[in-house]
């Protein structure tokens, strides 16, 4: 499975709230940098899973990837994601040894 295929499977498992599958795409030492009004850095698989599960608790929102671009080595993937409300983010995923080791997420637009 290529990194882009893994990323789309990762997105699918997030939308399905299949945390068992979701966590298999993450390195134990993954970091997630969330850039909004402030910067938050979440480190480690456990912290990442805790943060994402809290965000989706009792929240049925789904998202889709509207654009992506791969680096020549396919280890970096830039995405534009849009949720059901029209909120946008630019997320950059970094892969090492077939796992996501870093995500930088820029919150771009809140729906009106």
Briefly describe each language-model feature range.
Residues 9-10:
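Generic hydrophobic alpha-helical segments
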Residues 16-33:
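Short, well-ordered alpha-helical segments enriched in acidic and aromatic residues
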Residues 31-43:
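A short gly/proline-enriched turn/hairpin at secondary-structure junctions
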Residues 33, 51-112:
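A beta-strand edge to alpha-helix "cap/lid" segment located at domain peripheries
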């Amino acid at each position: 499975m290529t990194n882009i295929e893994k990323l789309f499977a990762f997105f699918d498992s997030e939308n399905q709230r299949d945390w068992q599958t979701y966590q298999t795409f993450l390195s134990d030492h993954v970091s997630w940098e969330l850039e909004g009004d402030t910067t938050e850095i979440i480190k480690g698989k456990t912290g990442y899973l805790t943060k994402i599960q809290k965000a989706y608790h009792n929240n049925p929102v789904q998202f889709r990837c509207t654009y992506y671009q791969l680096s020549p080595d396919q280890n970096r993937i830039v995405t534009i994601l849009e949720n059901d409300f029209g909120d946008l983010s630019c997320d950059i995923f970094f892969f090492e040894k077939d796992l996501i080791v870093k995500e930088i997420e820029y919150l771009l637009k809140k729906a009106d």
